[in-house]
């Protein structure tokens, strides 16, 4: 166990070498991406040793290196928490990043700033490591903000495109909302338990934890793109494909789920928060699965499937199974990163074409990418004995045992069948049928960087689930017998989704596409959410301020109150004065009659 700490720290601090090198001449060298990739591969190999040691001994460690400051009883120091979650997650993150870095060497080879791109990706990985291994809330917050800012920089990588800039801004703004919740939780823990260390927070008895846990749930909603704060994730697809593969599938977006997993000792006592988490996850997983059904951008379909899987992880936390949620995080990282890399390979080969309606018949020119995409899609749907099966099947089985939450299970099952449907749709549109793209495109996937990186993740997508699930601690549910129809539920709904998609595909091939239905519009326009949330408030505030400015100031004050009121007053007076017709005889006669009458009256009085 003596080597556990130094090896883990070596694996983490070795990643700083390429960042330090960025001030030297090596940073200007074209081999810099190669150095970064090699560093990450070495870090992965080193990190596997302490992980194996942890699996064999099961002994957690807390490494405190450097004390920073003390405020009353609050002690802030640089400390790393090496428990089950961090020791398993670090090799997974390093393995996936290693493959993505190698893929980036092929995908971004013509980019003039490729060295800076690799440095950004590496900085992102380091901040993710800080987040995962943090032992106190302050350190976790540094990692949390770090992944947020790196996400912003990498989504807006092609800053010449307006869409990329707005997408980056959208990501940072939605995450800001989540950060408010995080800071609120930090402040609550500081004032109530006077501690930011996880151990102290967990052992302190608290009366009512709803407020801090709500803050943490809001933070997770922002970072993990849950319903309400979800629109930034599909927009983030404006960034380069390696960014989508690393940040928006395998590592950064699971940070929110990871935060809730970290705080599971507080969550498991609080039924209110569990119910809220369950509701949020169930709504997200269904809504995003519905949205994925009709999208035409290949990356957006994969992005929505990511959001749907994140919803499934949140559901798992809601039924008080943090270890299962963590298992799904680890298994999901492999096949989702591979799906993004396959779509990146297709996009790059078809000269940056992302519309699946303009693809088709790619199984002949791109056999390796096709194989990987199909295996990745099957792993995503939870086909038996691929990686996704080990976590997804367990989650649905566990949910089956909770009869109180049957509605959440039902929604999750519908989302699972829809997962199979949109995966099949991608396979049909992209890989099978006749080519619908420009035949002049030079399709070539025989590049070692591309093949090796996808091959590694392909092996992970087949075997990783078995290896990780074999080492998961026993969950709170004891081994029990189960009727076979409950046991086969997950598989049954997945197969139903496949059959449904096959039927729909045949119908779509043979029938003419008429005017889109309202349901199609709802799915295609993302449930009208961006329109309502992004366009409507700004339009309403603009029209309201315009109306108040034009009506109140211009019309009422500057027109009616001062100039028009004076003119109206004078007009009334002048009309009264000048209301004479010029009939002199009549006036004279009336004057004479009045005079005569008054004289008669005066004389008669005398």
UniProtKB/Swiss-Prot annotation:
Q: An example of a Gene Ontology BP annotation on this entry?
A: mitochondrial respiratory chain complex I assembly
Q: Name the major location.
A: mitochondrion
Q: How does it assemble?
A: Core subunit of respiratory chain NADH dehydrogenase (Complex I) which is composed of 45 different subunits.
Cellular location(s): Mitochondrion inner membrane
**Reactions the enzyme catalyzes:** a ubiquinone + NADH + 5 H(+)(in) = a ubiquinol + NAD(+) + 4 H(+)(out)
The residue ranges crossing the membrane are 1-21, 43-63, 88-108, 117-137, 140-160, 171-191, 209-229, 241-261, 273-293, 310-330, 366-386, 413-433, 457-477, 488-508, 513-533, 582-602
- Its EC top class is translocase
**Molecular function, one GO term:** NADH dehydrogenase (ubiquinone) activity
Q: Its encoding gene is what?
A: MT-ND5
Query: What family is this?
Result: Belongs to the complex I subunit 5 family.
Name this protein carries in UniProt: NADH-ubiquinone oxidoreductase chain 5
Please give the Pfam families that the UniProt record associates with this protein: NADH5_C, Proton_antipo_M, Proton_antipo_N
What lineage does UniProt assign to this protein's organism? Eukaryota, Metazoa, Chordata, Craniata, Vertebrata
Any one GO cellular component localisation term in the record: mitochondrial inner membrane
Membrane topology field: Multi-pass membrane protein
Its Enzyme Commission number(s) read 7.1.1.2
What the protein does comes down to: Core subunit of the mitochondrial membrane respiratory chain NADH dehydrogenase (Complex I) which catalyzes electron transfer from NADH through the respiratory chain, using ubiquinone as an electron acceptor. Essential for the catalytic activity and assembly of complex I.
């Amino acid at each position: 166990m003596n080597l556990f700490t130094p090896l883990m720290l070596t694996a983490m601090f070795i990643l700083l070498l390429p960042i330090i090198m960025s001030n030297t001449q090596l940073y200007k060298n074209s081999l810099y991406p190669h150095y970064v990739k090699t560093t990450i591969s070495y870090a992965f190999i080193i990190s596997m040793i302490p992980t194996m040691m942890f699996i064999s001994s099961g002994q957690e460690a807390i490494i405190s290196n450097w004390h920073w400051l003390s405020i009353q009883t609050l002690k802030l120091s640089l400390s790393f928490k090496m428990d089950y979650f961090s020791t398993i997650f670090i090799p997974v993150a390093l393995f996936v990043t290693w493959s993505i870095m190698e893929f980036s060497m092929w995908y971004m080879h013509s980019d003039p700033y490729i060295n800076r791109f690799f440095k950004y990706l590496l900085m992102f990985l380091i901040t993710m490591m800080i987040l995962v291994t943090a032992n106190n809330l302050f350190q976790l917050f540094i990692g949390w903000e770090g992944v947020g800012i790196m996400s912003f920089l990498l989504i807006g990588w092609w800053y010449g495109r307006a869409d990329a800039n707005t997408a980056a801004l959208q990501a940072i703004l939605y995450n800001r909302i989540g950060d408010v919740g995080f800071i609120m939780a930090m402040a609550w823990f500081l004032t109530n338990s006077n501690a930011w260390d996880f151990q102290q927070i967990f052992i302190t008895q608290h009366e009512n934890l709803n407020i801090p846990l709500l803050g943490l749930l809001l933070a997770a909603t922002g970072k993990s793109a849950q319903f309400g704060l979800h629109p930034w994730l599909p927009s983030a697809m404006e960034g380069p494909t390696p960014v989508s593969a690393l940040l928006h599938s395998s590592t950064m977006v699971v940070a929110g789920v990871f935060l809730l997993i970290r705080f599971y000792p507080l969550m498991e006592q609080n039924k209110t928060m569990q119910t809220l988490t369950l509701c949020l996850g169930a709504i997200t997983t269904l809504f995003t699965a519905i949205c994925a059904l009709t999208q035409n951008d290949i990356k957006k379909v994969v992005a929505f499937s990511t959001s749907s899987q994140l919803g499934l992880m949140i559901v798992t936390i809601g039924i008080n199974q943090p270890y299962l949620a963590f298992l799904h995080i680890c298994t999901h990282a492999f096949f989702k990163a591979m799906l993004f890399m396959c779509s990146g390979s297709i996009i790059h080969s078809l000269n940056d074409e992302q519309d699946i309606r303009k693809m088709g018949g790619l199984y002949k020119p791109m056999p390796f990418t096709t194989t990987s995409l199909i295996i990745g899609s099957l792993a995503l749907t939870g086909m038996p004995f691929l990686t996704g099966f080990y976590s997804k099947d367990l989650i649905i089985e566990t949910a089956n045992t909770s009869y109180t939450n049957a509605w959440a299970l039902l929604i999750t099952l519908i989302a699972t069948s829809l997962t199979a449907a949109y995966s099949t749709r991608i396979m049909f549109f992209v890989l099978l049928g006749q080519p619908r793209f420009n035949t002049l495109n030079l399709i070539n996937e025989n590049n070692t960087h591309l093949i090796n990186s996808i091959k590694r993740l392909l092996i992970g997508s087949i075997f990783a689930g078995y290896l990780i699930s074999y080492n998961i601690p026993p969950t709170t549910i004891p081994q029990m017998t189960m009727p076979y129809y409950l046991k086969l539920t997950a598989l049954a709904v997945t197969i139903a989704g496949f059959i449904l998609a096959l039927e729909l595909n045949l119908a779509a091939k043979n029938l003419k596409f008429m005017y889109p239905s309202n349901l199609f519009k709802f799915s295609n326009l993302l449930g009208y959410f961006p329109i309502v949330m992004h366009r409507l408030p700004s339009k309403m505030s603009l029209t309201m301020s315009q109306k108040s400015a034009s009506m109140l100031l211009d019309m009422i004050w500057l027109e009616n109150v001062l100039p028009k009121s004076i003119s109206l007053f004078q007009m009334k007076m002048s009309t009264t004065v000048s209301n004479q017709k010029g009939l002199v005889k009549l006036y004279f006669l009336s004057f004479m009659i009045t005079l005569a009458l008054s004289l008669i009256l005066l004389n008669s009085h005398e």
